[in-house]
Amino acid sequence: MNVLVINAGSSSCKYQLINMESEGVLCAGLVERIGEATGKLAHKIAPDTDSEEKIVLEQPFPNHVEAMKKVVELITDPEKGVIKDKSEIYAIGHRVLLGGEEIKESVKIDEWAKGVIRDYIPLGPLHNPANLAGIEVAEELFPGVPSVGVFDTEFHQTMPAKAYLYPLPLELYEEMKIRRYGFHGTSHRYVTKKTAEFLGKPLDEVNIITCHLGNGCSMAAVKNGKCVDTTMGITPLEGLMMGTRCGDIDPAIVPFLMEKKGLTTAEADTLMNKQSGLKGVCGMNDMRDIHAAVEKGDEKAKLALDMFVYRIKKYIGAFYAALGRVDAVVFTAGIGENDDIVRAEVCENMDVFGIALDAEKNKIRSGEPRNIAAENSKVAVLVVPTNEELEIAQAAVNVLKG
C-alpha cells in the first residue's frame, strides 16, 4: 500500500511516496520556483539509503499542475520509476495549515472540507491557498484516488478555552474566531506517540513537554496524551523566538513602528515574520552559522543564542506549572534533534524541575529516539526524530479505513 504525501507551498511543492507496509520512502522530492522563468525539481529515489539516486531538472513549471505532472512522470518512469502506474497509489495525504475549529481531526477531502480551507484563508493567507491548490491538482491528476487533509491545527484542538482564548473582547472570538490555534501539530502528535512507546506507557497516561525546534519553533504541553497548551497562536508568529519570526512581543510595538517608521500593514508583517528572530538580532537564521560565529567571539550571535534558549526555558517552566507532573521533555526537528549545544543550554540549571542532562549522552548522534537525561534526573529528556510525512500518511490510511 503506497501513500503519496503532498505539502504544497505558494511557489513550491514537497512530496514523498511511502510504502506503508515497510514505512519506507520509495521516492521524495521538492519542486521550487513554480511560476517563475526557471523552476527546479530535485527528485530522490530511495532517499537516505545506500541505493539513493538523485535526479535534478531545471525547467519552467508554470503552475502546480505542470509541476506535479512531471513528478508523476518520474514516479512512473519505465526505467527510473518506483511504481508502474498511478493505480498503485492508495491515497494522497495533504499537509494543510489551518482547519480552524470545524476540523478537529484528519478528514477525507470533499467539498465541505475544501470550503473550510477556503474560509480560513484570511487567517492563513500564504499556506491555505497553496494547500488547496495541491488538493485540486491531486484531484485532477489522480482521479479516483482519495485525498485526505491532515491539518497542522488538529492536535491542538483539545486545548481548553482558558488556554486558547485571548483576553480580548469575547465578541471578536464569537464573530471572527480569533483564538489560539497552534501549529506543527502533526509533528507534536507524532513525537507524543513515539514518546509514549519509548517510555512504555499508555498514550493517555503521558504528560510531556514537546519542543519542535527548527527554523520555525513551537512547544506543546501534553497532558494524558492530549495537547492542553501550545506556544504558537492564531498564526505561527506567536511564542518562541525563531529563525526569522519574532515570537512573543508587546503588541503595542506594531502600531508604534507603523506610526514612527511609516510602515504599512504588509511591511510590519514582513518585519515580524521575515526580518526578526535570530536573523533580526544577529543577521543569521541558521543555528549552525550562529554557533560558528559565537566560537569566533561574535557578541550579537551570542546574544541571539541566549535569547533563543531563554524563551524555551521560560516556556518549559510555564508548561510544567500547567501540567503539574512531567514525564519527559522532548526535543525534535532540525535544531531539537541535532543541536547538542542548544539542548545543553536549555537544560542547564533546571534542577528545580528535576531536569538534568548527561553531557556525554547529549553529544551522541542517532536517528532513533533516545534518553539523554542524567541518571539522577527525575524527568526524562528525550530526543525523538520527527517524521511528519509518515504521520500524514498514517493519518490518511486511518481515515480511509475508518
From Swiss-Prot:
Gene Ontology molecular function, alphabetical: acetate kinase activity; ATP binding; magnesium ion binding
Catalytically driven reaction(s): acetate + ATP = acetyl phosphate + ADP
Residue spans crossing the bilayer: none
Catalytic residues as annotated in Swiss-Prot or TrEMBL: 152
Cofactors that this protein relies on: Mg(2+); Mn(2+)
InterPro entries per UniProt: Ac/propionate_kinase, Aliphatic_acid_kin_short-chain, Aliphatic_acid_kinase_CS, ATPase_NBD
CC annotations in GO: cytoplasm
The entry's keywords: ATP-binding, Cytoplasm, Kinase, Magnesium, Metal-binding, Nucleotide-binding, Transferase
Pfam families: Acetate_kinase (PF00871)
Record bears the keyword Nucleotide-binding: yes
Protein name as it appears in the record: Acetate kinase
Co-factor remark: Mg(2+). Can also accept Mn(2+).
Residues reported to bind Mg(2+): 7, 388
Coiled-coil features, chain-numbered ranges: none
Site description Transition state stabilizer, residues in chain: 184, 245
Subunit structure: Homodimer.
Lineage of the species this protein comes from: Bacteria, Pseudomonadati, Thermodesulfobacteriota, Desulfovibrionia, Desulfovibrionales
Family: Belongs to the acetokinase family.
Pathway this chain belongs to: Metabolic intermediate biosynthesis; acetyl-CoA biosynthesis; acetyl-CoA from acetate: step 1/2
UniProt record, GO biological process: acetate metabolic process; acetyl-CoA biosynthetic process
Its job: Catalyzes the formation of acetyl phosphate from acetate and ATP. Can also catalyze the reverse reaction.
